[in-house]
Amino acid sequence: MANETNTFSLNRKTQYLAAAVNDNVPYIQASRSYLKDKVEGKKCGLTYNFYFPDPGKAYAGTSEVDITNDLKVVQEREVSCTLMNARTSVELGTWERLTEIESFVNEVAEPRGMTLGTEIEIDSITRGWKVSDGARVVAAADLGMDDLAGIAADLKAIRSRGKFRGFADPSFFHSLGAKNLSLFLPSDIMREIYRSAFIGNYMDVDWVSETYMPTLSVTGTMTSAKVTEIGTDGVSVTGTNLYAGYMFELPNAYCVDMFGRKTKQKKVFIVDSVNGAGTAGKLSQRIVCSTGNAAEATAVQTNCNTFGTFGSICTSGLTATSLITESGDYSIVQARDADALEWDTYKHPSLAGCEESTQRVGKITCQVAKWANIATRQQVMRIDVPYISQMIDGRRSRLLVIKL
């Protein structure tokens, strides 16, 4: 009976931990599970390639009858996802001493859950915002509701069928003023999910206050960058004073919609990483070169997305036009389709000799293992939150870059 009681207590405490983490990850609440059945047996820290179906090409017209030259196989996009893990630990004496739920929640679950959730949130945002196909730059003094309406319109133009979410630092909403904030429409459903972080709906985007949206600090004189390589493993650029988050456009490169059709929006490329000297950068987004269908014969040369169709721009030596041309701090605001973010949890293998519990609440799966170190006679609780967080489609994300 004692073991049964202890097991129940461990499960209950693990559940409260999972709930506390789930309360502190607003960014990943706007996500979709694509890989739940594909990660079983996969190992933390390793990167795996997964494949997502493409809508393919369609043809219409009086001459579009012969399918001889049509592609006979389903197109698939390859996306690399790394299995991540967030962890913390608690000394067993603290864990066992707190037998009342309220005390445990206040002293262990909430503070540890907030810490774990914060790390997951920062990791997801840091990697996620850079997978965006479009951006608008505006000075803080000129910021208005038209700018929010603009990125909402950009998202609608790509004909995405999901629900749009927007994330910005709390100071951004404060800068809009009470009059403009009154234009955001309330939603009981969103309020239940995001609680006090939910601002409201504007132009079909549900806006959420998120403390960890990044601020770019740009220093030094920015010279024109050059594209040195475009391939299936990404894009390489060289320049001066490059930085992670450096945004640029290429000549005649435009965004495409969900069906591969060219839009009027210029395609934006965002650098993931740079060398220590800031002279070389890399975009990890895969790019595939191909020809278009007959209806796109003239437009295919300028069609471009992170995994889609290029024509003539699949060459090196192109001059990159920088979106940010002045030194200073720039606040990043992101609006995206919730389905553009892949989020899944998985389970670590059981540890022999440990008492364990695994519980899921909302988007979070929490694993707790209890064990003793014979050498030190110390007993410890290990808490893990294994996860996959990966933006899989830059077409469905837009940025508002605000010069502070």
Where do the protein language model's features map onto the residues?
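N-terminal "assembly arms/tails" that initiate or stabilize quaternary assembly
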Residues: 1-78, 397
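Short, Lys/Arg-rich flexible segments
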Residues: 2-35, 93-103, 112, 117-135, ...
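Beta-strand elements of well-folded, non-transmembrane domains
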Residues: 54, 252, 385-389
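Protruding loop/beta-arch "assembly-hinge" segments enriched in small, turn-prone residues
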Residues: 1-29, 42, 185-217, 312-404
